[in-house]
Amino acid sequence: MKLLIVFGLLTSVYCIHKECSIQECCENQPYQIEDPCPIHYYSDWFIKIGSRKSARLVQLCEGDYGKRIPIHYQMFGNYTISCEPLEINCQAPPVGSLIVRCSYDYDFVEHHDVRVVLDFV
């Protein structure tokens, strides 16, 4: 129990200093993630592998908006169920952290990233 409290506090402190979204879901159940990007912004979902700012981003969906489909990677199993809106199997990302990239432009020239933290119920 103490470990959960400490983890919750560390996550909250991390989210205060960086843009972050905390969402609750039932573990190992399908979950439609709430998009933290502002209205009228495009969003693209990634798994960030590594903790550095320059860490590699692995894209979860591909295709044009309105016709996006999940990319299934062997190392992630069936993590991504659908893309519009994003639906995943509620579990911690197999590696790294879940990131959504928000941009007002379709080409994502200017963007900001939001880390999505899942709290399991």
UniProtKB/Swiss-Prot annotation:
Note: This protein corresponds nearly to the fused 8a and 8b proteins of SARS-CoV.
Disulfide bonds: 25-90, 37-102, 61-83
Keyword tags: Disulfide bond, Signal
Protein name per Swiss-Prot or TrEMBL: Non-structural protein 8
Domain of life according to the entry: Viruses
Pfam families given in the database record: bCoV_NS8 (PF12093)
Xref: PROSITE patterns: SARS_ORF8_IG
All copies of domain SARS ORF8 Ig-like, residue ranges: 19-121
CDD domains membership: ORF8-Ig_bat_SARS-CoV_HKU3-1_type-III-like
InterPro entries per the UniProt record, alphabetical: ORF8_bat_SARS-CoV_HKU3-1-like, ORF8_betacoronavirus, SARS_ORF8_IG
Cleaved signal peptide residues: 1-15
